[in-house]
């Protein structure tokens, strides 16, 4: 186990452009809960070096809910789940665009439309593209998370002004068969590569709390590093009644913080955005995500669960002496 001085020295070497060997990085995620706070100085150093005290804010809209053919064990939208959720087909262009247009006058950086299902038809992608094209992207950048798409569909989004595509790996490859059996891990990897080839930046991360070991946390982090993704959404499982993982063991707040700090050391210059399960899993410790290395948060509601409202998150940033990220436009 590394001494506190060695931990900070590791972060300084990363800051200088060095890449520690994987064994050194593995020692960080393997630390016990009661030593998690020792990772904060290095993680905070790296976050501030690459991102200062500004925080990326993003908001999502569930554009198509439920009735998903896939069997992801954590997901309430799967047809295999018996969760009590609202299910509906793709909503109208106006309803897809309106939340994004309302964000134009707020500090929110990105607005994303997220849909259930393995993927969308080209007609549905066209609807989403037209909706997102109606948003002033100098005021709020647009993203999409529409499942497995082909190059032509990804190009359609790009041509509509969408600059980022979201598609999670969800878990380490060695765990994936326990998470989903209706599509492969490699299909997810290829979708990420296709989005990059289409000229889109990529938001790609996973969900923690699926039963992964420390080494599987590292396996996922190293895969994200190898894919050179631009942004990493970090979700912590909120077990939902009616899903295969409704009785999953709850993550400790300190483990959540250690995962964030580990990711910051592995992916020092990437946007790390804490998304689903932030308050549910971290409770009173959720403001510490920034000192653990997070450079962004998702604000507002999630797909089928509620989140914190924007006003509360802006007040939190002010209390911490942080500011919303300046808009790209």
From Swiss-Prot:
This is Biotin synthase. Gene3D superfamilies: Aldolase class I. Keywords: 2Fe-2S, 4Fe-4S, Biotin biosynthesis, Iron, Iron-sulfur, Metal-binding, S-adenosyl-L-methionine, Transferase. Homodimer. InterPro entries: Aldolase_TIM (IPR013785), BATS_dom (IPR010722), Biotin_synth/BioAB (IPR002684), Biotin_synthase (IPR024177), Elp3/MiaA/NifB-like_rSAM (IPR006638), rSAM (IPR007197). [4Fe-4S] cluster binds at residues 68, 72, 75. Disulfide bonds: none annotated. It is an enzyme of class 2 (transferase). It comes from Desulfosudis oleivorans (strain DSM 6200 / JCM 39069 / Hxd3) (Desulfococcus oleovorans). Belongs to the radical SAM superfamily. Biotin synthase family.
């Amino acid at each position: 186990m590394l001494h506190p001085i060695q931990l900070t020295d590791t972060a300084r070497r990363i800051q200088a452009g060095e890449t520690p060997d994987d064994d050194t990085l593995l020692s960080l995620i393997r630390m016990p809960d009661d030593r998690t706070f020792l990772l904060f100085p290095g993680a905070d150093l790296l976050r501030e070096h690459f991102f200062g005290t500004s925080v990326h804010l993003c908001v999502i809209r569930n554009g198509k809910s439920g009735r998903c053919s896939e069997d992801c064990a954590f997901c309430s939208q799967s047809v295999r789940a018996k969760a009590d959720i609202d299910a509906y087909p793709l909503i109208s262009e106006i309803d897809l665009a309106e939340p994004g247009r309302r964000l134009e006058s707020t500090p929110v950086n990105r607005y994303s439309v997220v849909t259930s299902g393995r993927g969308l038809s080209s007609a549905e992608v066209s609807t989403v593209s037209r909706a997102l094209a109606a948003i002033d992207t100098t005021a709020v950048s647009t993203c999409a998370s529409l499942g497995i798409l082909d190059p032509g569909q990804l190009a359609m989004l790009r041509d509509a002004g969408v600059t980022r595509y979201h598609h999670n790996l969800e878990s380490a490859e060695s765990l994936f068969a326990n998470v989903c059996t209706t599509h492969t891990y490699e299909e997810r990897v290829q979708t990420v590569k296709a989005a990059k080839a289409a000229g889109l930046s990529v938001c790609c991360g996973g969900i923690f709390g699926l039963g992964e070991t420390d080494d599987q946390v590292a396996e996922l982090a190293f895969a994200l590093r190898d894919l050179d993704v631009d942004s990493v959404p970090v979700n912590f499982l909120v077990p939902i009644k009616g899903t295969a993982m409704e009785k999953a063991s709850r993550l400790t707040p300190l483990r959540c913080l250690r995962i964030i700090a580990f990711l910051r050391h592995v992916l020092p210059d990437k946007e790390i955005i804490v998304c689903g399960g932030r308050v549910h899993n971290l409770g009173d410790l959720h403001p510490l995500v920034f000192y653990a290395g997070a450079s962004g948060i998702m604000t507002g509601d999630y797909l089928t669960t509620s989140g914190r409202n924007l006003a509360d998150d802006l007040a939190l940033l002010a209390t911490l002496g942080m500011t919303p990220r300046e808009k790209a436009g």
